[in-house]
From Swiss-Prot:
Keywords: Ribonucleoprotein, Ribosomal protein, RNA-binding, rRNA-binding. Gene3D superfamilies: 3.30.1370.30, 3.30.1490.10. GO terms for cellular component: ribonucleoprotein complex; ribosome. Pfam families: Ribosomal_S8 (PF00410). Part of the 30S ribosomal subunit. Contacts proteins S5 and S12. Belongs to the universal ribosomal protein uS8 family. This is Small ribosomal subunit protein uS8. One of the primary rRNA binding proteins, it binds directly to 16S rRNA central domain where it helps coordinate assembly of the platform of the 30S subunit. One of its GO terms (molecular function) is structural constituent of ribosome. InterPro entries: Ribosomal_uS8, Ribosomal_uS8_sf. GO terms for biological process: translation.
Amino acid sequence: MTMTDPIADMLTRLRNASAAKHETVDMPYSKFKANIAEILKREGYIKDFTAKEAKVGQTLEVTLKYGPNGERSIQGIKRISKPGLRRYAKSDALPMPLGGLGIAIISTSSGLLTQKECLDRGIGGEIVAFVW
């Protein structure tokens, strides 16, 4: 059976692995997922990510990040725009998750950006996910 929302699958794998205190999590590779992982790394939510060759296709391995006492750096992660209901926002109406404590990942014509980068550039786009 084909997967209808591979981005939601990625976010769920990250959420579950973080809750279970796993060191790494593997998932099928795509450029879009690698771009999301790049944003999460840049914002300090994960340690690192690598693309590995598998028997069939490529695998994206994400190394999760925890605090000194084992607290999760990803407290929550939520898919916003879904295949059945796409969510878009203009640059002046971009959401600020948890009053600015989290990030919104936005798919724009300039690639994937956070809401702060979109505000700086004055562009809007599709709201992919919230991370806090």
